[in-house]
């Protein structure tokens, strides 16, 4: 009982902290930066990460297995994964601008996990025989980490497309590490200077060009990491399936959509490394992949069919 109470308390504390972090970030965008608030939001993300880590450890202790056996537990692990992708650059550079993606992702997944829709599967249960394997940790953790990385990378690509294809854009200025719009700018006003076969953007929109390049670079790195996790997850799942069901691949809904997801992001990496294609081409592919991931992740749980329907819930 005490473990369940601690888990409940930590869940609501982390949700409250994330809400405050998002509010602070929006305030910083509206009024540039309020002294001390940016520092508080960074510490808030760290505190939220520790809370989510604590509740996962508590659930692991009283359930006796890694909390990855149903939709509720995988959503909480996905929230933790979003926080991880914030923490890595933060501890490396003592600053991370990824909270614009990771904070909403954390609160969305954690909020859905703790909603009434999943109330019936909040309680930890004994694993079914098929899940009582050492492959559970490797396969499911790699898949959920890949979902978090690919979702973050895809959202960066969506942001890149918005900046590229808007007819009316804004001039961007760098202020304390953030790229902020300071005024309207139409593409017809952008001047290019061609000298010695090198193309330079006008100084007026130099930061916009920098932002596009950084978004392209960040999305490529994050998606590449997610693709690696996805590949490891699929391969470990195939080995696990062979041990459990006697076949490496069965083409059930989850496996089919995992293969589609892998194919989409393989195409992304191909277009990204092809120098004859523009960055917008790969960004479009990644944007499509964003929706494919959610179909792959929630599809089987909503339908409740196939070999991967453990922990699914019924819509009433």
UniProtKB/Swiss-Prot annotation:
Domain of life: Eukaryota
Record-linked Pfam families: Cytochrom_C_asm
Keyword Chloroplast: yes
InterPro entries per the UniProt record, alphabetical: Cyt_c_assembly (IPR002541), Cyt_c_biogenesis_CcsA (IPR017562), Cyt_c_biogenesis_CcsA/CcmC (IPR045062)
Single Gene Ontology BP annotation: cytochrome complex assembly
Any single GO CC term annotated in Swiss-Prot or TrEMBL for this entry: plasma membrane
Topological category with respect to the lipid bilayer: Multi-pass membrane protein
Predominant location: plastid
Keyword Transmembrane helix in annotation: yes
Annotated family: Belongs to the CcmF/CycK/Ccl1/NrfE/CcsA family.
Oligomer status and interactors: May interact with Ccs1.
Summary of the function given for this chain in its UniProt record: Required during biogenesis of c-type cytochromes (cytochrome c6 and cytochrome f) at the step of heme attachment.
Protein's recorded name: Cytochrome c biogenesis protein CcsA
């Amino acid at each position: 009982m005490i473990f369940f109470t601690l888990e409940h308390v930590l869940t609501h504390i982390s949700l409250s902290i994330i809400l405050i972090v998002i509010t602070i970030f929006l305030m910083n965008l509206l009024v540039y930066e309020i002294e001390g608030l940016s520092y508080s939001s960074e510490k808030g993300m760290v505190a939220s990460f520790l809370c989510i880590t604590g509740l996962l450890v508590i659930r692991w202790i009283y359930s006796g297995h890694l909390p990855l056996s149903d939709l509720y537990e995988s959503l909480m692990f996905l929230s933790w994964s979003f926080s991880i992708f914030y923490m890595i650059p933060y501890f490396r550079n003592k600053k991370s601008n990824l909270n614009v993606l990771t904070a909403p992702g954390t609160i969305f997944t954690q909020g859905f996990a703790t909603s009434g829709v999943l109330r019936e599967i909040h309680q930890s249960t004994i694993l079914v025989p098929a899940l009582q394997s050492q492959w559970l940790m490797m396969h499911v953790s790699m898949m959920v980490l890949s979902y978090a990385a690919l979702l973050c990378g895809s959202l960066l690509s969506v942001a890149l497309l918005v900046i590229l294809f808007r007819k009316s854009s804004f001039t961007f200025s760098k202020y304390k590490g953030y790229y902020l719009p300071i005024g309207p700018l139409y593409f017809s006003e952008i001047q290019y200077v061609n000298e010695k076969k090198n193309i330079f953007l006008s100084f007026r929109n130099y930061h916009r060009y920098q932002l596009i390049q950084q978004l392209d670079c960040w999305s490529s790195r994050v998606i590449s990491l997610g693709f690696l996790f996805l590949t490891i997850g699929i391969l470990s799942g195939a080995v696990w399936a062979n041990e459990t069901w006697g076949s490496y691949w069965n083409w059930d809904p989850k496996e089919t959509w995992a293969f589609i997801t892998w194919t989409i992001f393989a195409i992304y990496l191909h277009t990204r490394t092809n120098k004859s294609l523009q960055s917008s081409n790969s960004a479009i592919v990644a944007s499509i992949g964003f929706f494919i991931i959610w179909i792959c992740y929630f599809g089987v749980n909503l339908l409740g069919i196939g070999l991967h329907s453990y922990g699914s819930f019924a819509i009433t």
